[in-house]
């Protein structure tokens, strides 16, 4: 599903690629490079996702799939059954919190 995080638009295929990568890493108990992603997302913000948790978060990028390094502000959320839950961002949120990306939560 296409989504805009802050002022950054993502196509449906970019969102799907991030979700698929998160799923593959999660299922193989692996992470992107030397990072901790994907990792547990506790949904402290209380987003009403279309699928039930538990959730994993994984960075979403405009250029290719995240493979390590700085994660940036934007995340795709999947559940541990690899269902897409939504996209969220630190952009526009206070502290280390998240807000929903448009068209996605």
UniProtKB/Swiss-Prot annotation:
Gene3D superfamilies: Microbial ribonucleases. Belongs to the ribonuclease N1/T1 family. It is an enzyme of class 4 (lyase). The keyword Metal-binding does not apply. Signal peptide: none annotated. Disulfide bonds join 5-101, 23-82. Its EC number is 4.6.1.24. GO terms for molecular function: lyase activity; ribonuclease T1 activity; RNA binding; RNA endonuclease activity. It comes from Gibberella baccata. The active site is at 39, 57 (proton acceptor), 90 (proton donor). Keywords: Disulfide bond, Endonuclease, Hydrolase, Lyase, Nuclease. This is Extracellular guanyl-specific ribonuclease Fl1. It catalyses: [RNA] containing guanosine + H2O = an [RNA fragment]-3'-guanosine-3'-phosphate + a 5'-hydroxy-ribonucleotide-3'-[RNA fragment].
């Amino acid at each position: 599903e296409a989504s805009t995080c802050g002022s950054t638009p993502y196509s449906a295929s970019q969102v799907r690629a991030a979700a698929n990568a998160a799923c593959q890493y999660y299922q193989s108990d692996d992470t992107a490079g030397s990072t901790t992603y994907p990792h547990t997302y506790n949904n402290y913000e209380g987003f009403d996702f279309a699928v039930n948790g538990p959730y994993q978060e994984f960075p979403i990028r405009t250029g290719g799939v995240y493979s390590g390094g700085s994660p940036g502000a934007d995340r795709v959320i999947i559940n541990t059954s690899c269902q897409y839950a939504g996209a969220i961002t630190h952009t526009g949120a206070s502290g280390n919190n998240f807000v929903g990306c448009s068209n996605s939560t």
